[in-house]
Design a protein with these regions (language model features):
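Glycine-rich, anion-gripping cofactor-binding loops and their flanking helix/strand elements
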Residues: 50, 54, 65-66, 71-72, ...
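Glycine-rich, acidic loop regions that bind phosphate or pyrophosphate groups
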Residues: 80, 90-136, 224-318, 419-420, ...
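Glycine-rich phosphate/diphosphate-binding loops that line cofactor/substrate pockets in enzymes
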Residues: 1-11, 52-57, 81, 139-144, ...
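Phosphate/pyrophosphate-binding active-site segments
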Residues: 127, 267-355, 461-465, 470, ...
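N-terminal cofactor/phosphate-binding cores enriched in small/glycine residues
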Residues: 1-63, 69-72, 78, 361
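Active-site diphosphate/adenylate-binding microenvironment
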Residues: 2-3, 7, 17-28, 316-397
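Thiamine diphosphate
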Residues: 90, 97-110, 362-517
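Structural signature of the thiamine diphosphate
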Residues: 2-5, 10-13, 55-64, 70-75, ...
Length: 517
């Protein structure tokens, strides 16, 4: 029954982890016309599925056995919720009578993700087949702009193939209704110096660039980051622009997902704000929201561009000039990478410092137009970055590079523990001997615990972890070694890691001096 319901959807793919209780599900899904991968680690498996859904713009699902295995789906579920990604997690469960009665691999798992879901389905062995079929239909119908949990209790036997029993016809899918025309609130219709913030944007939503350019022509200031999928000449770099100050700003519109620039949010605090998104939460980023609208991001942006009055006085570009940096450090590494990646690539950015270097260099116009930029900026820390990038390339088949830190790569050490061959993902690991970002802020240093409790200063490398996961491995410690290693790394026919060793103190100095004195 479940397999028949799933067969009606166009899946980006599905990922399973080994386990007994999920055996009936795996046996049912094996004939689905969708790519399938098996990963040992459930945390990595869910992030693989997340990456596939993001890259393909179609739902993906992950399957696991009962007990704590299901809890390991949690980080990917939370990321999918805040990044508005159609991720389905299917958790096998034990019959309800066995929960809390001393049985192995049995926990209270029906509601473990409830606060971070857009829908769920709890199957029940005591109900009829048609009742359970309706539960599955309802869960699948809600699989849009966020994660859904399907919990499936299974009684033994688990491995026997039994004749299929047909349930009633599949429930109706939601009707496709023409979107309502967006109505501009007064704060925007009467604004003279409005600002549009374009947050993280999934390419499957549609091309935001034409509407953004039309708004800029009409006199709007547009600010964004590379995760907006906009070319850098279509918008100003969000944080650096706001650092220059916008004294006559009278309205802010935010659309899309999360954005990185923490200081920018503080700069905009108190500004009159209109937030647009497909569902809750529609965040009050500046403590001053005056209007909220529910709409598909692409449709809303088009309507805004069509309806916004022509203000007749475009903003002048507001970009700070970057200072030259010397020597081999993180800034030099990121500049070198930016100049080597062509427009047909997908770039995945690790959290912490990599995405911040990407933001800065995007604002300097260093990335080729057409590159798609991705990162787990919904809510995640360093978890699941390699897994998400692998799942993304697996689904998209586009050349893909992940730029991440050594702690992030080590943390996601289950990413490559797959049964089938890995996609030929390229990973640049910037090894600055710890969590570099904690050197950028004063609190950790003043605590006296910077190296131990915050930065986790170390002398490790990722070579053994990379090779254990099936990546070929190269390393470099200066620009000459980097240039020598790059051609074979980027052209490797399989998955490959290039680890770049940098000095953390020189990297800190270059970052803090990026605009000069």
């Amino acid at each position: 029954m479940i397999r028949d319901r799933f067969a009606h959807l166009d899946w980006a793919g599905w990922v399973a982890s080994p386990g007994s209780r999920c055996a009936p599900l795996v046996l049912a899904f094996r004939d689905l016309e969708a790519p399938n991968q098996v990963l040992l680690d459930e945390r990595s498996a869910a992030h693989w599925a997340l990456g596939a859904a993001i890259a393909a713009g179609k739902p993906a699902f992950a399957v696991c056995t009962s007990g704590t295995a299901a809890l390991n789906f949690g980080p990917a579920v939370a990321e999918a919720f805040y990044q508005q990604v159609a991720l389905l997690v299917v958790t096998a469960d034990r019959p309800a009578a066995l929960i809390d009665n001393g049985q192995g691999q049995s926990i209270r798992q029906e509601r473990i993700f409830d606060d971070h879901l857009v829908g769920k389905g709890l199957l029940n062995l005591d109900q009829t087949l048609d009742w359970n079929a309706a539960v599955v239909d309802q869960a699948l119908a809600s699989l849009k702009f966020g994660p859904v949990h399907l919990n499936v209790p299974m009684a033994e036997p688990l491995y026997e193939v039994v004749p299929s029993r047909a349930a009633g016809p599949s429930g109706d899918r939601p009707l496709v209704v023409a979107p309502l025309k967006l109505e501009l609130p007064d704060l925007v219709r009467h604004a003279k110096r409005p600002l549009l913030v374009v947050g993280q944007w999934n390419p499957s939503w549609g091309d935001a660039e034409p509407a953004v350019r039309e708004l800029a022509r009409k006199g709007w200031m547009i600010v964004a980051e590379p995760l907006s999928q906009l070319p850098s000449d279509a918008a100003e770099q969000l944080e650096d622009t706001l650092e220059l100050g916008l004294p006559d700003l009278d309205a802010v519109v935010s659309i899309g997902g999360a954005w990185v620039a923490k200081n920018a949010k503080a700069k905009l605090r108190g500004c009159r704000h209109w937030v647009i998104g497909p569902r809750d939460p529609l965040p009050d980023l500046f403590g001053s929201v005056q209007s909220r609208s529910y709409a598909h991001p692409y449709d809303a942006l088009k309507d805004l561009a069509d309806q916004a009055p022509d203000l007749g006085s475009p903003w002048a570009p507001r970009r700070r000039s970057a200072a030259a940096s010397e020597g081999w450090q993180d800034m030099a590494v990121h500049r070198a990478i930016a100049q080597k990646i062509s427009s047909d690539w997908d770039l995945h950015w690790g959290n912490s410092t990599p995405i911040r270097y990407a933001n800065f260099l995007w604002g300097q116009g260093l990335y080729a137009p057409g590159i798609r930029h991705f990162g787990n900026r919904g809510v995640s820390g360093i978890d699941g970055q390699t897994s998400t990038a692998l799942g993304s390339m697996w689904a998209s088949q586009r050349p893909t590079l992940l730029v991440t830190g050594e702690l992030s790569f080590l943390y996601d050490g289950g990413a490559g523990l797959a049964y089938d061959a890995l996609p030929a993902l390229k990973v640049v690991v910037v090894n600055n001997q710890g969590g570099q970002i904690f050197q950028w802020i004063e609190g950790p240093r003043a605590s006296g615990l910077l190296d131990r409790n915050f930065g986790f200063r170390h002398r490790r490398n990722v070579g053994a972890s990379a090779e254990n996961q099936g990546f070929s491995y190269r390393s470099a410690g200066n620009i000459v070694e980097f240039e020598a290693a790059w051609p074979s790394f980027i052209s490797d026919s399989g998955p490959a890691v290039l680890e770049l060793f940098t000095d953390p103190d020189a990297s800190e100095k270059a970052w803090k001096g990026r605009f000069g004195a």
